[in-house]
C-alpha cells in the first residue's frame, strides 16, 4: 500500500513539473513586449501608466545582465528614477493621504490650463520613456536570444 501512495506522489509531482510552465523566460518577456507594442496608443492614462511600469519591470530584469556604465543604461536609469518619483504608486494605485492631501488642496488653486499642460507633459514623458524602454528591450532581448542560440 505504501508503494502505491509513494508512486502516486511521484506521478503527481511529475505532472506538476511538466505542466504549462515556460522553460524560456526570454520568450515570455519577448511575448509580453510584443503585447505592449501591439497597442501603441493606450486607451487612457491609466493604461499608459500601467504599460510604462511593465516596460520598466522588463527593463530592470534585463538591464542587470549588462556591464555597468553603458551610457544608454545610465540615461534610462535616470529617466526611470525621474518617472518613478513623479508617479509614486502603491500596488498600482496612486498614493493617498498625508502630504499628498496638502498638495492636492494646493493644486485646487492652480488654473485648469496649467493642470492640463502638466497632464500633457506627464503623458508625453511617459510615452517617451515607454518608447525608449521598448526600443532598448527589443535589442536586448533579441541579443540575448541570439547569444543563447550560439552557445
Curated annotation (Swiss-Prot):
Major location (coarse): secreted
Chain coiled-coil ranges: none
GO cellular component: a single term: extracellular space
Record-annotated membrane-spanning stretches: none
A Pfam family recorded for this sequence: Turandot
Keywords of this entry: Immunity, Innate immunity, Secreted, Signal
Domain of life: Eukaryota
Protein's GO biological process: cellular response to heat; innate immune response; response to bacterium; response to heat; response to oxidative stress; response to UV
Signal peptide: 1-23
Subcellular location: Secreted
Task performed by this protein: A humoral factor that may play a role in stress tolerance.
Family that this chain belongs to: Belongs to the Turandot family.
Protein name: Protein Turandot Z
Source species: Drosophila pseudoobscura pseudoobscura (Fruit fly)
